């Protein structure tokens, strides 16, 4: 499984960014995306996820065309896990239901649910509603949900920005194991690569 982005450009705040941007991330690899605040890093992930159409270019996920001049695959058909910076939890359902929302209802889902919940220290919060959670708990819930969908590609926007050192390490260890075991690519936006002491980045992309 790999993600290949060819000659992508996209509009952002009346500017065109990423002109002829090329990215290739292979199976089991991590890529980090850096750049000044407001430069369009999140917009790039939105383009990859299908939440925004690029102006030009092509996106392939394991040889399947997601974007081209003649093809546009809708977000729900891309099998991409996306951890949003603002978490994007469903406000009127519990932590458990948020996590299981994207579950594919396979036999091993219960085991995965238990593993992820324990790894991210969510056991005591499963019956709570999102408004009862701290920013860190919401972030871990969103990460857990994205892993439960068993995606072919994982996108993460500042996934440890609200976490203390212990929980940040727990997230990194779980995600690193998950990406390598499932052999999928992962793209992470971060303002500080030094936060990531448990993840090895194969690719670094700076947007300016």
Indicate where each model-derived feature is located.
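Helix-to-loop junction immediately C-terminal to a conserved catalytic motif
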Residues: 49
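ABC ATPase NBD coupling module
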Residues: 66-81
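Hydrophobic anchor residue at the start of the ABC signature
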Residues: 143
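Conserved ABC ATPase signature
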Residues: 129-133, 137-139
């Amino acid at each position: 499984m790999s993600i290949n982005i060819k000659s992508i450009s996209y509009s952002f705040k009346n500017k065109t960014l990423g002109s002829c941007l090329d990215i290739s991330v292979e199976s089991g690899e991590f890529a980090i995306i850096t750049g000044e605040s407001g430069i369009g890093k999140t917009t790039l992930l939105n383009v990859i996820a299908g939440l925004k159409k690029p102006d030009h270019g092509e996106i392939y996920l394991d040889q399947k065309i997601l974007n081209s001049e003649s093809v546009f695959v809708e977000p729900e058909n891309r099998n991409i896990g996306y951890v949003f910076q603002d978490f994007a939890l469903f406000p009127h359902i519990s932590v458990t239901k948020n996590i299981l929302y994207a579950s594919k209802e396979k036999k091993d889902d219960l085991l995965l649910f238990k593993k992820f919940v324990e790894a991210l220290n969510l056991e005591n919060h499963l019956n709570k509603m999102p408004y009862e959670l701290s920013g860190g708990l919401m972030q871990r819930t969103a990460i857990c949900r994205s892993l439960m969908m068993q995606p072919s590609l994982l996108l993460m926007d500042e996934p440890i920005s609200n976490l203390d050192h212990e929980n940040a390490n727990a997230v990194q260890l779980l995600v690193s194991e998950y990406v390598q075991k499932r052999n999928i690519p992962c793209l992470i936006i971060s303002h500080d690569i030094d936060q990531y002491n448990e993840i090895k980045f194969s690719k670094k992309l700076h947007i300016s």
